[in-house]
Every structure is written in C-alpha cells, then in structure tokens.
C-alpha cells in the first residue's frame, strides 16, 4: 500500500492533525525526527509492518508492542497519537502518515528532499557540495539528503529533486555520448 493514492488520502488528514498539534507545542522538528526513526524501523522490519497491518491481532497487543518498541524514545504526544491510530484502526497507514508529516515539515521549513545516487559513499565534503548545489538550484533553505549506492554508475552522481533529475554520472555521460554518436551516423 505504500505510496498508493488511497493510503495518501487517508494519511493526509492524520498527518495534518499531527502537524497542527506539533506546531501548537513547538515540537515540529522533534516529531519529524521521531517520524524518521519510525520509518527506519518499519523499513528494516517486514515483520513489524505485517504485525501492525494484521486485522487478526488485537489492538491491545499492537499498543503493547508499540509501547515496548518505541517506549520513551519518541515524544509522548506522538506515542499518544500512535495509540489513537490503533484505536481508530488506522495504524496500518502509519508509514504513509509519517511520510506525509515529513512532507508537510519540509514544506513548512522550506526544505527539499533530494535523492542522491552515487557509485560510492559520499564524503562529508561531497555531501556539502551536493547540498550547496541543490540549494542554489532550488532556492531552498535546507536540503534533506536520501542517499543510495549504485556501483554501476562508475562515477559521479544522479540527483533527483521532486520531478527533476540531474544526471552527472559517468554512466549518464557515456549514454549521452552513445546516443549522440548513433544519432550522428
């Protein structure tokens, strides 16, 4: 269900409600960090995703597991919000709600999400250079980098910001040269 229109439509009002609560308490960034942690946990554990999505498992069991797993590691307002999602049988949309909340937070803080694919892990200097370049291109105040490694790129990076793709990879350059050579003959 990840990324489906249906889950986005259901997740949006919950994410907006969470954002309203966070703004009223001046904890938007703290809740954002907690949402990132939850997304990391969900991404790492297919078993947890299946557990919270299962209609067979009792709500009290879901609450217990979430409390044990997240405990005091997340803000108590978010923990209460998760319990509400369990009670309303909307916990199945937790991933979509967290993703939507982070999108709202990026909009609020004039932050862009950039997906960067490189052939090797970026050094701190390279990360700074990429962030500076993205800020210059987009006018954003800050940049959230999501990095991925693809050894097939040979060298360079591919940067995706929204629907724009900047291909500065060696593989991309070779492909463009190949296209221009085949088009010239």
From Swiss-Prot:
The protein here is known as ATP synthase subunit delta
**Family note:** Belongs to the ATPase delta chain family.
Q: Which GO terms describe its cellular component?
A: plasma membrane-derived thylakoid membrane; proton-transporting ATP synthase complex
Q: Does the keyword Chaperone apply?
A: no
How would you describe this protein's topology in the membrane?
A: Peripheral membrane protein
* Any Pfam family the entry gives: OSCP
Q: Name one GO molecular function term.
A: proton-transporting ATP synthase activity, rotational mechanism
| Protein location | Cellular thylakoid membrane
- Keywords associated with the record: ATP synthesis, CF(1), Hydrogen ion transport, Ion transport, Membrane, Thylakoid, Transport
Q: Which SUPFAM superfamilies match?
A: N-terminal domain of the delta subunit of the F1F0-ATP synthase
InterPro entries per UniProt = ATP_synth_OSCP/delta_N_sf (IPR026015), ATPase_OSCP/d_CS (IPR020781), ATPase_OSCP/dsu (IPR000711)
Gene symbol of the encoding locus: atpH
Broad class of where this protein is predominantly found: membrane
**Role:** F(1)F(0) ATP synthase produces ATP from ADP in the presence of a proton or sodium gradient. F-type ATPases consist of two structural domains, F(1) containing the extramembraneous catalytic core and F(0) containing the membrane proton channel, linked together by a central stalk and a peripheral stalk. During catalysis, ATP synthesis in the catalytic domain of F(1) is coupled via a rotary mechanism of the central stalk subunits to proton translocation. This protein is part of the stalk that links CF(0) to CF(1). It either transmits conformational changes from CF(0) to CF(1) or is implicated in proton conduction.
Origin species, per record, is: Crocosphaera subtropica (strain ATCC 51142 / BH68)
Q: Which Gene3D superfamilies match?
A: N-terminal domain of the delta subunit of the F1F0-ATP synthase
Question: Quaternary structure per UniProt?
Answer: F-type ATPases have 2 components, F(1) - the catalytic core - and F(0) - the membrane proton channel. F(1) has five subunits: alpha(3), beta(3), gamma(1), delta(1), epsilon(1). CF(0) has four main subunits: a(1), b(1), b'(1) and c(10-14). The alpha and beta chains form an alternating ring which encloses part of the gamma chain. F(1) is attached to F(0) by a central stalk formed by the gamma and epsilon chains, while a peripheral stalk is formed by the delta, b and b' chains.
